[in-house]
Amino acid sequence: MPNPGSTSSPGSIPEEIRNLLADVETFVADTLKGENLSKKAKEKRDSLIKKIKDVKSVYPQEFQDKGDAEEGDEYDDPFAGPPDTISLASERYDKDDDGPSDGNQFPPIAAQDLSFVIKAGYLEKRRKDHSFLGFEWQKRWCALSKTVFYYYGSDKDKQQKGEFAIEGYDVRMNNTLRKDAKKDCCFEICAPDKRIYQFTAASPKDAEEWVQQLKFILQDMGSDVIPEDEDEKGDLYDDVDHPVPVSSPQRSQPIDDEIYEELPEEEEDTASVKMDEQGKGSRDSVQHPSGDKSTDYANFYQGLWDCTGSLSDELSFKRGDVIYILSKEYNRYGWWVGEMQGAIGLVPKAYLMEMYDI
């Protein structure tokens, strides 16, 4: 009779036990990693992890090294049975494309070292559990940095668990991902023939904010230059593109030669004065839309996040900086014209919040 404690010739482990051990390892090593545990709980967690590793070392043929892959997202369980209906329907959500992987396209970076973070916070990320437990949501600290979506175990991690460039993707709310109280907190980032990423936010409002910020960046990526409406362009630059016509004495007849007689130089001077007055009036109307800037509280805004202008006509500002809005004529494109410390330029309205509650 074989000795249960012997490790010289270990037998095979039943599939149910392997799956259960994989579930326990995922829960202890990954799920509890981002939780605030007591000292005693942490010691117990470390002890369980060590025991699991010992078992896997005794039965190396039963377990394959999954490396640093992201909790089952980046590999297939070699011990999983034939895929059921749920697995087949969800395969596209949980495995990478046949081409290059979405992950590991960017160098490792600590969560605290990310720059130009537009939106960040804890989300539940959906993954495929390669066992009888089916799907599972795991807590992840996510950050949208420029055009890359990063996800970490926590905001203290020194390296991301995964990331993907959002270019080519679309984002939308999806209340069919869950059947519990969080069903209205779900959204997904998807694209044809690409892996789908699904998340659950803390509240419906937080989920909508993620969707809005992602949509704003995706729309902004579609055009490097802000389009101009021809009518608006004509109205704004009417005094430059269409100068006041100067009549020539050779081509027109004076109304009354005896009363009105102007030399060409005088007509040109008069036209120049009119153009200067019109230009000055236009500038005054733009810089002071409400008359008195000092009391025009409705047009004072402050930065929600740091923003670095990529073009010369864009303002750069930091979170909390005060910006006075001169014009909202590009509102349809998500941009306003603002002034900060004497500098005037375009500012993304999504990066601003009202300074005064009027």
UniProtKB/Swiss-Prot annotation:
Which Gene3D superfamilies does the entry mention?
6.10.250.220, Pleckstrin-homology domain (PH domain)/Phosphotyrosine-binding domain (PTB), SH3 Domains
Location in the cell reads: Cytoplasm
Predominant localisation class: cytoplasm
Q: Provide the residue span(s) of the region labelled Disordered.
A: 60-108, 227-293
Ranges of compositional bias, category Acidic residues: 255-270
- GO BP of this protein: B cell activation; negative regulation of cell population proliferation
Q: Which residues carry this modification: Phosphoserine?
A: S6, S9, S87, S90, S223, S272, S282, S285
| Start-end of Low complexity biased regions | 243-253
Q: Locate the SH3 domain: which residues?
A: 296-357
Query: Pfam families attached here?
Result: PH, SH3_1
GO CC annotation terms, alphabetical: cytoplasm; plasma membrane
Q: Which residues form the PH domain?
A: 116-219
Query: Highest taxon of the source?
Result: Eukaryota
> Basic and acidic residues bias: where?
274-293
SUPFAM superfamilies given for it?
Answer: PH domain-like, SH3-domain
Which residues belong to the signal peptide in this entry? Answer: none
Give residue numbers for the modification (Phosphotyrosine). Answer: Y75, Y151, Y197, Y260
Assembly and binders: Interacts with FYB1, which is required for SKAP2 protein stability. Interacts with PTPNS1. Part of a complex consisting of SKAP2, FYB1 and PTPNS1. Part of a complex consisting of SKAP2, FYB1 and LILRB3. Interacts with LAT, GRB2, PTK2B, and PRAM1. May interact with actin. May interact with FYN, HCK and LYN. Interacts with FASLG.
According to the UniProt entry, the note on domains is: The SH3 domain interacts with FYB1 and PTK2B.
* Its job: May be involved in B-cell and macrophage adhesion processes. In B-cells, may act by coupling the B-cell receptor (BCR) to integrin activation. May play a role in src signaling pathway.
Give the family from UniProt.
Belongs to the SKAP family.
What protein name applies here?
Answer: Src kinase-associated phosphoprotein 2
Q: Which organism is it from?
A: Rattus norvegicus
| Gene giving rise to this polypeptide | Skap2
